[in-house]
């Protein structure tokens, strides 16, 4: 397509090519020399796992991700690092799509929300040696004291375990964020999550529900179940059930080191009747 001095070439597939532009001589000018340029096209493929994180991010930013992929599609990542004292060495896990532009008016537009993760097709939760226990030592805990005081915003899980005390480019040391692949961290975007950020047995109080900016987050009760039983009843007014769970997919997760063993997995909603 030629428009004045601009030549536009539309890509029809991904790959590399050399484009040569030539102009014939006219009645009042001689033919100029040919011009060549090399181009690389990174159009997404419909198999999510075949795309790199830059390509996925570009489709997300353009608002076209759901033209290529579907809720539930998976992409493998390798987690590698020490996460609050628990060593994870080259663990391959599939992240899966929870939804596109989920709750966009509140949480941010042009985003793909993923969950970690699955091993093969089995949903898993990352479990350390502290699973099922309470205490003050480091571990995959909500808090290092047996309380939900301060809600999600000030929790040990949010800031230290997941690493929201830092950023993807400068993650909190020994956090899950720091153990994620650098290519994934390079394209991560924050979302605005609404949660009871007071807790401490204060009950159903609307003003307790405030926002946080999170790169990694646990899901809320309503986001998984589409109903509320134990969360502050006002949380659901700011939340939407994820399309993945709305479609009826299993909510059961299994231990990442023993995929036949079902485990409890954390949600970020504080129990409104307990401290």
Question: Language-model segments: which ranges?
Answer:
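Extracytoplasmic soluble-region selector
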Residues: 1-43
């Amino acid at each position: 397509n030629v428009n004045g001095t601009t030549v536009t070439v539309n890509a029809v597939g991904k790959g590399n090519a050399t484009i040569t532009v030539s102009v014939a001589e006219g009645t009042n000018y001689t033919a100029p020399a040919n011009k060549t340029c090399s181009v690389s096209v990174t159009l997404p493929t419909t198999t999510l796992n075949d795309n790199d994180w830059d390509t996925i991010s570009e489709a997300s930013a353009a608002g076209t991700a759901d033209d290529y992929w579907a809720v539930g599609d998976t992409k493998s990542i390798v987690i590698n690092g020490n996460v609050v004292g628990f060593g994870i060495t080259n663990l391959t896990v599939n992240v899966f799509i929870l939804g596109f532009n989920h709750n966009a008016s509140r949480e941010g537009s042009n985003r793909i929300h993923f969950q970690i993760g699955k091993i093969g097709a089995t949903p898993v939760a990352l479990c350390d040696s502290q699973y099922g226990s309470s205490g003050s030592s480091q571990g995959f805990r909500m808090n290092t004291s047996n309380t939900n005081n301060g809600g999600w915003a000030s929790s040990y899980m949010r800031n230290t375990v997941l690493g929201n005390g830092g950023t993807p480019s400068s993650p909190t040391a020994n956090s899950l964020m720091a153990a994620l692949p650098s290519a994934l961290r390079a394209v991560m975007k924050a979302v605005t999550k609404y949660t009871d950020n007071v807790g401490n047995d204060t009950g159903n109080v609307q003003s307790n529900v405030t926002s946080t900016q999170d790169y990694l987050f646990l899901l809320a009760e309503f986001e998984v179940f589409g109903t509320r039983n134990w969360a502050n009843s006002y949380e659901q007014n700011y939340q939407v059930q994820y399309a993945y769970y709305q479609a009826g997919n299993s909510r059961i997760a299994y231990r990442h080191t023993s995929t036949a063993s079902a485990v409890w997995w954390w949600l970020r909603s504080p129990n409104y009747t307990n401290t």
